[in-house]
């Protein structure tokens, strides 16, 4: 086999941080000079997470080629330089759909189609497709869910078969949770033992066990896990809960020397990993920064932090680059009192979303920011909020709205794209993926990007209505970014406002700790400037 494969499974409980672990491993292996590809296998039956409730699933991360994926791919992007595409993700829904299509097309020649071998063979094919597309030295495959879940069984069986065929080129990591019982005053290894037993009963013997814990595990505990899980004590690794930031994770794994252990077992010759730049950034995150701002994030999923995961991380990246700490206030736009908090903030960010709930509250927030000179950053739906508010209160189109919120509005300043009007199905009908955007010289965004054309990722159905663009321009709303191919409005700025910008795309999908997105940097800079004229109470 021309590549090595690392499989990452999880046990005991969900939400262990397998995605962060996989992303951190990718960073470490890249810093050792290896080319890495990544694949997330999700056992749920949805074809993709595009129509799943953000409260249940968190945000939907979009790739350049327009695939709606799990938020873990956002971690992969922010930590590493891996190429993420349609080959980087697969769900049970996709796997079953592929198999059923082949059966309908007669490709199984009348065979009885079963989970084994047809579903498992298709899972193996997905793994090989990812490798063929990316030509990596190492492919990291994260399996969602928890060992013992019935929906994970086909994926684990496929991995067992793959390891059997390519034993010398595969490495299996099982991640578990080792709880500390305060009443007993000790950690308990039994859940880890049972989880590994479940994995071994399927036929997968882990090459390493990665134990998540609240405090460092003693050598005695590691030896106990080694003995009862039948792995060498040198293959039992420990990561504790991070103190300050998720970006500490690669440094923890580096201290455990897990990447070196993996490369030696796989026979890979690598250079010593250099994390000096990462260490410097993390060290700054651990200490108070000289500047401080307050930001209000106005949305409708604010009770669930993962719903806006990439936005939160992008704010962290930009603020760190400016030696700034951010006190972030998640504000529910349905809360009748949220404006009281927003008035105290140095900036307001309205992220993407769908549906009418909370819509009017967001428009009120945009009006407050416009009238008081508070920096405002509208992303996707947040840009549409800006445009509708401007149309209502500056153009005096009292009933201006988006047809998503009011299909009978007399002034549809935001409307569905013509080519989508005839589509009925909800899934897969949006403008998805990376599109070019031409910037207007002399605009704020041109100064931030420093180039005439950019590529940004989209996920939306509605656009600024061409019929209202000239009116908006005449009243001071500049269209400073357009799609060269279709002339669609992609970026707006209010001419006489310190910093009020809306973008139809999702810049948060491109930000990294080591390379903050210029729009977020510009937004934080504007908020810092605004804060100098305020006194905190």
From Swiss-Prot:
Record's function text: Catalyzes the ATP-dependent amination of UTP to CTP with either L-glutamine or ammonia as the source of nitrogen. Regulates intracellular CTP levels through interactions with the four ribonucleotide triphosphates.
Modes of activity regulation: Allosterically activated by GTP, when glutamine is the substrate; GTP has no effect on the reaction when ammonia is the substrate. The allosteric effector GTP functions by stabilizing the protein conformation that binds the tetrahedral intermediate(s) formed during glutamine hydrolysis. Inhibited by the product CTP, via allosteric rather than competitive inhibition.
Pathway the protein contributes to: Pyrimidine metabolism; CTP biosynthesis via de novo pathway; CTP from UDP: step 2/2
Subunit annotation: Homotetramer.
Residue ranges constituting the Glutamine amidotransferase type-1 domain according to the UniProt record: 294-533
UniProt GO cellular component terms: cytosol
Binding, Mg(2+): 72, 142
Keyword Nucleotide-binding: yes
HAMAP family to which the protein is assigned, alphabetical: PyrG
Similarity field: Belongs to the CTP synthase family.
EC class name: ligase
Region (Amidoligase domain): 1-268
Binding site for CTP: 14, 149-151, 188-193, 224
Gene: pyrG
Entry-linked PANTHER family: CTP SYNTHASE, CTP SYNTHASE-RELATED
Binding-site residues, ATP: 15-20, 72
Statement: the UniProt record of this protein carries the keyword ATP-binding: yes
EC number(s) given by UniProt: 6.3.4.2
Chain segments annotated as transmembrane: none
Protein name, per record: CTP synthase
Coiled coil: none
Annotated GO MF terms: ATP binding; CTP synthase activity; glutaminase activity; identical protein binding; metal ion binding
Record key words, sorted: ATP-binding, Glutamine amidotransferase, Ligase, Magnesium, Metal-binding, Nucleotide-binding, Pyrimidine biosynthesis
General remark: CTPSs have evolved a hybrid strategy for distinguishing between UTP and CTP. The overlapping regions of the product feedback inhibitory and substrate sites recognize a common feature in both compounds, the triphosphate moiety. To differentiate isosteric substrate and product pyrimidine rings, an additional pocket far from the expected kinase/ligase catalytic site, specifically recognizes the cytosine and ribose portions of the product inhibitor.
Domain of life: Bacteria
């Amino acid at each position: 086999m021309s590549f090595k494969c690392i499989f990452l499974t999880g046990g005991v409980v969900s939400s262990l941080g397998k995605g962060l672990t996989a992303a951190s491993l990718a960073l470490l292996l890249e810093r050792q000079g290896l080319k890495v590809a990544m694949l997330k296998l999700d056992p749920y039956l949805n074809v993709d997470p595009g129509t799943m409730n953000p409260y249940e699933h968190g945000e939907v991360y979009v790739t350049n080629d327009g695939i709606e994926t799990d938020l873990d791919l956002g971690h992969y992007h922010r930590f590493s330089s891996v190429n993420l595409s349609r080959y980087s993700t697969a769900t049970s829904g996709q796997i079953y759909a592929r198999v059923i299509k082949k059966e309908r097309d007669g490709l199984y020649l009348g065979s009885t189609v079963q989970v084994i071998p047809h579903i498992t063979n298709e899972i193996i094919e997905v793994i090989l497709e990812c490798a063929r597309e990316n030509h990596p030295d190492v492919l990291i495959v994260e399996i969602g869910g928890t060992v013992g879940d019935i929906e994970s069984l086909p994926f684990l069986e496929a991995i067992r078969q793959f390891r059997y065929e390519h034993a010398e080129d595969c490495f299996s990591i099982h991640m578990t949770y080792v709880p500390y019982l305060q009443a007993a005053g000790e950690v308990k290894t039994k859940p880890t033992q049972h989880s590994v037993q479940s994995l071994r009963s399927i036929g997968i013997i882990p090459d390493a066990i990665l134990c998540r814990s609240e405090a460092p595990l003693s050598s005695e505990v590691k030896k106990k896990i080694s003995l009862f899980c039948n792995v060498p004590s040198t293959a039992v690794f420990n990561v504790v809960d991070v103190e300050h930031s998720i970006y500490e994770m690669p440094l923890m794994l580096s201290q455990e020397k897990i990447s070196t252990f993996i490369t030696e077992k796989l026979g890979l010759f690598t250079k010593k990993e250099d994390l000096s730049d990462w260490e410097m950034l993390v060290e700054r995150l651990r200490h108070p920064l000289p500047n401080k701002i307050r930001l209000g994030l106005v949305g409708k999923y604010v009770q669930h932090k993962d719903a806006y995961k990439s936005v939160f991380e992008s704010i962290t990246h930009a603020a760190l680059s400016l030696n700034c700490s951010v006190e972030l206030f998640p504000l529910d736009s349905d809360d009748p009192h949220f404006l009281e908090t927003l008035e105290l903030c140095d900036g307001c960010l309205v992220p993407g979303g769908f549906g009418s709930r909370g819509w009017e509250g967001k428009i009120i927030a945009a009006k407050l920011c416009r009238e008081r000179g508070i920096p405002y950053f509208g992303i996707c739906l947040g840009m549409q909020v800006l445009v509708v508010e401007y149309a209502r209160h500056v153009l005096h189109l009292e009933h201006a709205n988006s047809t998503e919120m009011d299909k009978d509005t007399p002034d549809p300043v935001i409307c569905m794209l013509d080519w989508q009007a005839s589509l009925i199905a909800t899934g897969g009908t949006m403008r998805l993926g990376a599109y070019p955007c031409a910037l207007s010289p002399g605009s704020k965004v041109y100064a931030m990007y420093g180039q005439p054309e950019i590529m940004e990722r989209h996920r939306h159905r509605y656009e600024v209505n061409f019929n209202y663009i000239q009116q908006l321009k005449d009243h001071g709303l500049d269209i400073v970014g357009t799609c060269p191919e279709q002339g669609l409005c992609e970026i707006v700025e209010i001419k006489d406002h310190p910093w009020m910008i809306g973008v139809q795309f999702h810049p948060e999908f491109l930000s990294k700790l080591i390379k903050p997105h210029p729009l977020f940097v510009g937004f934080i800079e504007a908020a810092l400037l605004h804060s100098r004229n305020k006194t905190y109470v």
